[in-house]
A protein has these predicted regions:
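Surface-exposed alpha-helical interface segments used for non-catalytic interactions
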Residues: 40, 107-111, 149, 153
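Short alpha-helix of the ABC ATPase nucleotide-binding domain corresponding to the H-loop/switch region
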Residues: 68, 106-107
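Conserved Walker
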Residues: 76-87, 92, 98-105, 111-128, ...
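Conserved post-Walker A coupling segment in P-loop NTPases
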Residues: 14-82, 86-94, 98-99, 162-169
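Nucleotide-binding/hydrolysis machinery
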Residues: 4-14, 20-24, 30, 34, ...
Length: 169
């Protein structure tokens, strides 16, 4: 799906309906601010809306410990005001600029996503919907060998491309 040449505010719930009906990972490629607005809207419309929406900026130097905290409830510390009980809830994790992760963390994230239970109320320890964004096309980074192919395919279950003409909310 390509979202282009119109305000993100004009994007209807119908545009997100396929992703709302699924618990699969979603990857937004394009404008980062727009991607986060769409991720928040998707969270609000989904079965995960009763849990927290936790954003992790993968381009920041402290991305690794923050990402590991959100994906490992057992060892979780405070992340962006999310206390341990809040992290234990089923919710949505938004990985902003996931393409900026280093190779080691890409591999670890891929392994963690392989064990992730992606249903609200799931019995496994970690219950999260993962939505990610990248301002660069990750498929070309996979072709270049600079992005982990397994992680790309785990994140790219539902892919939405945001044109440079779209404007954030």
């Amino acid at each position: 799906m390509t979202i282009q040449e119109r305000d993100v505010a004009a994007i209807t719930d119908v545009d997100l309906s396929h992703a709302v009906q699924s618990d699969a990972c979603v990857l937004f490629t394009g404008d980062d601010g727009t991607a986060e607005a769409l991720a928040r809207r998707l969270h609000a419309l989904s079965g995960w809306r009763h849990g927290p929406f936790i954003a992790v900026d993968c381009s920041l130097p402290d991305a690794e410990p923050r990402l590991l905290q959100v994906l490992d409830v057992e060892n979780a510390a405070i992340v962006e005001g999310a206390t341990r009980p809040r992290l234990a809830q089923a919710g949505t994790v938004f990985l902003r600029e996931v393409g900026k992760l280093g190779p080691g963390l890409q591999r670890r994230l891929s392994e963690r996503l392989a064990t992730l239970k992606t249903r609200p109320g799931a019995e496994r320890r970690l219950r999260r919907r993962v939505i990610s964004s990248s301002s660069v096309p990750l498929d070309s980074r996979v072709q270049e060998g600079t992005f982990d192919a397994r992680l790309f395919y785990r994140l790219n279950v539902i892919h939405m491309v945001i044109s440079g003409h779209a404007r954030g909310w």
